[in-house]
């Protein structure tokens, strides 16, 4: 199987320096949301027709984007104003905006408890400002916070262990935070490569896939604790997505501008697909096995089908 280029979607031009960041798909409405950080927007794409629909404005420094299909919610981390927003996915109506911490970025959600973990990058000039905040979405309040051992990157939630897993850039770790005790870390996994960055979960296979700035893809088995090197990457990565339909892992590498595709069962590299220099983020529409790479130099999205 391989990624076949279907075409490109024109997106709004950048209003200032920067480009795109995290993206996510709401599968019921076929809406694809991507943080357009340079515009303080989230751009909305119809993933069924591959058309740009509109932009959601006023999300200063939009960085993290996450969708809960279970609750039809859209979450954004607004790094430029230290807030998170909660919107109705599919309709894009803002329901809540809340202070979360300093420079929020990574997001993960427990749909059964309605708990949103926010990874706050922090400010080097402010001590203990790299934190993880836990927000009770139903109560609309922060219910816990923990100081992290370093700058956080992305995060995921695992239903079986009822825990959040969060990348720390330096020291290179993945930390575990139980949803029931959000003010403390339970466990730390030491990564064999520098700069854990992108993170995603294979819930059936029980593996976390961590893409590290040291150009390595690392897998952590959540049941056994085994840590293994999956393979070398084409360069320093950013976003990682796991596709459960095909058991493929997609890693966006901005320099030189490629997607590295791995087989999650055999733990091997399948192919490397050129995108565009600077294309460090992507999204996956699982129903159609589509992969979207966001191209900052030309403010477009490249659409691929994994087939």
Descriptions of predicted regions:
Residues 1-307:
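Predominantly soluble domains enriched in secretory-pathway, periplasmic, or organellar proteins
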């Amino acid at each position: 199987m391989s990624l076949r280029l279907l075409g490109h979607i024109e997106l709004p031009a950048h209003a200032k320096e920067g480009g795109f960041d995290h993206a996510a798909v709401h599968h019921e409405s076929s809406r694809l949301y991507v943080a357009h950080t340079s515009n303080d927007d989230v751009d909305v794409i119809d993933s069924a027709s591959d058309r740009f629909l509109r932009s959601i404005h006023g999300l200063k420094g939009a960085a993290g984007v996450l969708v809960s299909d279970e609750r039809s919610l859209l979450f954004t981390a607004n790094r430029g104003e230290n807030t998170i927003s909660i919107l109705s996915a599919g309709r894009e109506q803002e329901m809540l905006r809340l202070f979360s911490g300093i420079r929020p970025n990574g997001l993960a959600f427990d749909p059964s408890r309605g708990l949103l973990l926010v990874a706050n990058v922090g400010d080097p000039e402010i001590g203990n400002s790299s934190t993880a905040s836990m927000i009770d979405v139903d109560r609309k309040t922060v219910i816990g916070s923990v100081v992290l051992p370093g700058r956080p990157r992305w995060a995921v939630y695992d239903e079986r262990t009822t825990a959040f897993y969060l990348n720390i850039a330096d020291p290179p770790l993945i930390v575990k935070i139980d949803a029931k005790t959000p003010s403390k870390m339970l466990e730390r996994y030491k990564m064999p490569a520098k700069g854990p960055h992108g993170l995603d979960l294979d819930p059936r296979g029980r593996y976390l896939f961590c893409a590290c700035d040291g150009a390595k893809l690392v897998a952590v088995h959540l049941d056994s604790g085994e840590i293994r090197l999956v393979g070398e990457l084409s360069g320093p990565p950013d976003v990682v997505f796991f596709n459960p339909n095909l058991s493929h892992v997609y890693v966006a590498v901005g320099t030189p501008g490629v997607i590295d595709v791995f087989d999650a069962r055999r733990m091997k590299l399948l192919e490397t697909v050129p995108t565009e220099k600077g294309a460090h983020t992507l999204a996956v529409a699982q129903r159609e096995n589509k992969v979207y790479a966001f191209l900052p130099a030309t403010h477009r999205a490249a659409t691929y089908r994994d087939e």
